[in-house]
């Protein structure tokens, strides 16, 4: 079996086929058989194989399914018809658990049916498209499927094994979009619910059925509306129920109209009272208000709102005691503005814009603007705080240029060359005596260059050792000396042996 795993290409994609005999894990080869794998995976996602039977089982050979009709001749692919075979040189029917497409005993006739092999099937090579294999212990569930009882035409006997559902754990094609399949006529008919029929009481089965039936009739008569002689007799002098209903509706409509008229009259009276109160608070009781211009009307409305807020007690909150003390002055100024034309309207708009662009110099000016501007007083507490925050923010925005200029000047002073006016560096050593602090000029501290005298011993090149005093160790020289010494000892020994002896 080791040669099988070496020759077969790696898989990509996994599907679990849940059957009545247990789950079957199927791994796919989308690179080697892209059309077949795409067809199989999309049909699984659409639930095409759910509750379909294995219509053909041959023990020791194969288990075939994928036909929704269960006849062995049905089934359709996602391409709208049959599609071509896909053969690969490294995919063969060399062992059990191979998953391949079933065809109509002719090439390029693949649909939706597929089969699992139960053993080695060499004679099917190059005839059926292989697109997957069964992995893990689920191969034993497949073998149990192959052991079911079958008839003479290889059809499993009842109950036939089924595909309950299919789960796609790893989809090799991310662009697959499941289709919305049309429902069959049987399913649509089952979904149409019949209207519930009212059950009929079978009173004849009871011993007291006749009495119960009479009671039912009496109740039915009581439920009916009681009719008067006006409705029963056909007399034109008598009014029918319809006529009385019409009169009742007419009277109701009249009541509604009268109520509406009363409400409208109340609204008009309230508006008149309101207009009189406005004229009283402003102080203009004359009837010739038509010639009043829009500016005066705006001033009147502002003063009216301010007076109403004073009566309610909703005065603008002051952040400091200074603002509280100046609240009386603000009220006096507001009353003076109400007598004459608003000074706010007489000021040119360009002056106000220049004030906004320049920003307000201090919080005192901001307080002055708050008292002077009647529009700001009309705001509530939160809105007024937000407007003041905007003014302060606008004031701070004008100081950015000056702050940046000061920062740049400081950088230039720091980066100046640390030399004195005589362009001679001042050397400070650790042994220098301290100078009197009273006579020291602190303005020249940036012109000082800190420099220390070099310490001996730290500079490796300042040693005074004699290079000839170093001892040189040469291993080869030492080895040669040893050899020379041995030769000298041997020569001396030889001389001692031949000493005192003649050559004759």
Curated annotation (Swiss-Prot):
Catalysed reactions, as listed in the record: [protein]-peptidylproline (omega=180) = [protein]-peptidylproline (omega=0)
One Pfam assignment: Pro_isomerase
Regulation: induction: Up-regulated upon pathogen infection.
Tissue: Ubiquitous.
GO MF annotations, alphabetized: peptidyl-prolyl cis-trans isomerase activity
BP term (GO), one: protein folding
Any one of the GO CC terms: plasmodesma
Function of the protein: PPIases accelerate the folding of proteins. It catalyzes the cis-trans isomerization of proline imidic peptide bonds in oligopeptides. Involved in plant response to pathogen infection by increasing PAD4 expression in absence of EDS1 up-regulation.
Family: Belongs to the cyclophilin-type PPIase family.
Protein name (database record): Peptidyl-prolyl cis-trans isomerase CYP57
Species in which this protein is naturally found: Arabidopsis thaliana
Source lineage: Eukaryota, Viridiplantae, Streptophyta, Embryophyta, Tracheophyta
């Amino acid at each position: 079996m080791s040669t099988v795993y070496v020759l077969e290409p790696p898989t990509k994609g996994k599907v679990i086929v849940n059957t009545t005999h247990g789950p079957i894990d199927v791994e796919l080869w989308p690179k080697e058989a892209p059309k077949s794998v795409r067809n199989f995976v999309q049909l699984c996602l659409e639930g095409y194989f759910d509750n379909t039977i294995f219509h053909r089982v041959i023990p020791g050979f194969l288990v075939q399914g994928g036909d929704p009709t269960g006849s062995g001749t049905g089934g359709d692919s996602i391409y709208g018809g049959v599609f071509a075979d896909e053969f690969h040189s490294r995919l063969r029917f060399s062992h059990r658990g191979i998953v391949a497409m079933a065809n109509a005993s002719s090439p390029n006739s693949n649909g939706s049916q597929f089969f699992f092999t139960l053993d080695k099937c060499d004679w099917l090579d190059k005839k059926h498209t292989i697109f997957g294999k069964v992995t893990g212990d689920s191969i034993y569930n497949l073998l149990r499927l192959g052991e079911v009882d079958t008839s003479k035409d290889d059809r499993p006997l009842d109950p036939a094994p089924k595909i309950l559902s299919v789960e796609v754990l790893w989809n090799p094609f991310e662009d697959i979009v499941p289709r919305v399949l049309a429902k069959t006529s049987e399913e649509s008919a089952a979904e149409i619910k019949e209207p519930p029929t009212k059950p009929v009481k079978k009173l004849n089965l009871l011993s007291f059925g006749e009495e119960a039936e009479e009671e039912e009739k009496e109740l039915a008569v009581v439920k009916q509306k009681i009719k008067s002689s006006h409705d029963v007799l056909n007399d034109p002098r008598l009014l029918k129920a319809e006529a009385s209903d019409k009169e009742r509706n007419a009277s109701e409509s009249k009541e509604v109209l009268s109520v509406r008229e009363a409400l409208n009259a109340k609204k008009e009276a309230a508006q008149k009272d309101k207009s009189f109160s406005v004229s009283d608070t402003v102080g203009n009781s004359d009837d010739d208000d038509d010639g009043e211009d829009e500016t005066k009307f705006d001033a009147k409305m502002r003063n009216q709102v301010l007076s109403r807020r004073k009566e309610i007690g909703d005065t603008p909150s002051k952040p400091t005691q200074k603002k509280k003390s100046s609240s009386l002055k603000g009220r006096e100024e507001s009353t003076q503005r109400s007598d004459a034309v608003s000074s706010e309207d007489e000021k040119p708009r360009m002056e106000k814009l220049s004030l906004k662009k320049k920003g307000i110099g201090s919080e005192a000016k901001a307080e002055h603007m708050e008292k002077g501007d009647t529009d700001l007083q009309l705001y509530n507490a939160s809105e007024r705080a937000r407007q003041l925050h905007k003014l302060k923010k606008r004031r701070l925005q004008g100081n950015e240029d000056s702050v940046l200029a000061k920062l740049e000047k400081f950088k230039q002073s720091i980066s100046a060359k640390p030399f004195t006016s005589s362009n001679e560096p001042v050397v400070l050593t650790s042994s220098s005596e301290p100078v009197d602090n009273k006579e020291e000029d602190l303005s020249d501290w940036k012109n000082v260059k800190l420099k220390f005298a070099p310490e001996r011993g730290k500079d490796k090149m300042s040693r005074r050792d004699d290079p000839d005093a170093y001892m040189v160790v040469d291993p080869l020289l030492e080895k040669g000396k040893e050899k020379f010494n041995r030769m000298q000892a041997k020569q001396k020994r030889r001389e001692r042996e031949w000493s005192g002896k003649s050559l004759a």
